[in-house]
């Protein structure tokens, strides 16, 4: 089975399944350690087993917290993926991202990186678009890149914008696309 990486179609669901598996394994391990305490006669070892169980909770919680944040976001609908897929040959395209900061949880079904800007489609109409654009642009400027991210919440507008983008030429490539790629994937969980 091929591993689905961050930014590839199907990442949200694959990542969710992987995290559920890890959290379940931790929960079973913690339960085994706690139950086995009752079969050990020495008090010192019982205490060590209790400490072990408590310490196992920390990585389990570390895996569970992003899972809880991303729980309600499913993989991008196949129809939308099929509509954006033709642009993969022309531009750098990412799917199934969830961009977060302390004030923002924004699902991004598709992100296209182009020298004229970063174009993101967010299906959640309740996201404060101006605030989200400001956050992403500040991060880009902090990395000495052009802060020109555009977030669209209307599917039709997003697809029209992609259709209007001109093809990349060698003169357009200033090398910033790979840096922007790292930044956008770094912002996503």
Each model region followed by its residue ranges:
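Membrane-proximal soluble helical/coiled-coil segments
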Residues: 90-158
């Amino acid at each position: 089975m091929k591993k689905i990486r961050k930014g590839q179609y199907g990442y949200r669901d694959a990542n969710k399944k992987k995290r559920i598996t890890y959290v379940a394994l931790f929960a079973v391990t913690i339960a085994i350690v706690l139950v086995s305490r009752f079969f050990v006669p020495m008090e010192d070892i019982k205490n060590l087993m209790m400490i072990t169980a408590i310490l196992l909770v920390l990585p389990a919680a570390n895996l569970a917290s992003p899972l809880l944040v991303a729980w309600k976001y499913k993989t991008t609908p196949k129809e939308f993926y099929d509509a954006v897929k033709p642009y993969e040959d022309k531009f750098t395209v990412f799917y199934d991202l969830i961009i977060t900061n302390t004030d923002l949880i924004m699902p991004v079904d598709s992100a296209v990186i182009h020298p004229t800007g970063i174009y993101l489609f967010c299906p959640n109409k309740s996201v404060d678009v101006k605030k989200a654009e400001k956050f992403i642009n500040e991060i880009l400027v902090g990395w000495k890149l052009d802060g020109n991210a555009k977030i669209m919440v209307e599917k039709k507008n997003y697809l029209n914008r992609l259709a209007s983008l001109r093809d990349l030429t060698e003169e357009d490539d200033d090398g910033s696309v790979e840096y922007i790629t790292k930044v956008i994937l770094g912002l996503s969980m």
